[in-house]
Amino acid sequence: MTQQAKVARTLTGKVVSDKMDKTITVLIERRVKHEVYGKYFTKSSKVHAHDEKNECRIGDTVTVAESRPLSKTKTWALVKIEERAAEV
């Protein structure tokens, strides 16, 4: 048997909530073309991601990767923080 390494899916989005312990909510937006009319529009989805060190803050741009289910709704894990939000 040959072992093939599975490549985890990664997405980039913005942190919209960090109120939970070791969990962040990430808003992922993508541009989609309408099949009939050809107009581009924005679709978005929110995912819960595991943040082991509680280092993310609201407004940060992050990369998350698919992982095994960690809870009922949490199946993504934080890979890295791309850009920090401005301190107010």
UniProtKB/Swiss-Prot annotation:
Coiled coil: none annotated. Pfam families: Ribosomal_S17. One of the primary rRNA binding proteins, it binds specifically to the 5'-end of 16S ribosomal RNA. This is Small ribosomal subunit protein uS17. Part of the 30S ribosomal subunit. PANTHER family: 40S RIBOSOMAL PROTEIN S11 FAMILY MEMBER, SMALL RIBOSOMAL SUBUNIT PROTEIN US17M. It comes from the Bacteria. Disulfide bonds: none annotated. Belongs to the universal ribosomal protein uS17 family. It comes from Cellvibrio japonicus (strain Ueda107) (Pseudomonas fluorescens subsp. cellulosa). GO terms for molecular function: rRNA binding; structural constituent of ribosome. GO terms for biological process: translation. Signal peptide: none annotated. InterPro entries: NA-bd_OB-fold (IPR012340), Ribosomal_uS17 (IPR000266), Ribosomal_uS17_bact/chlr (IPR019984), Ribosomal_uS17_CS (IPR019979). Keywords: Ribonucleoprotein, Ribosomal protein, RNA-binding, rRNA-binding. GO terms for cellular component: cytosolic small ribosomal subunit.
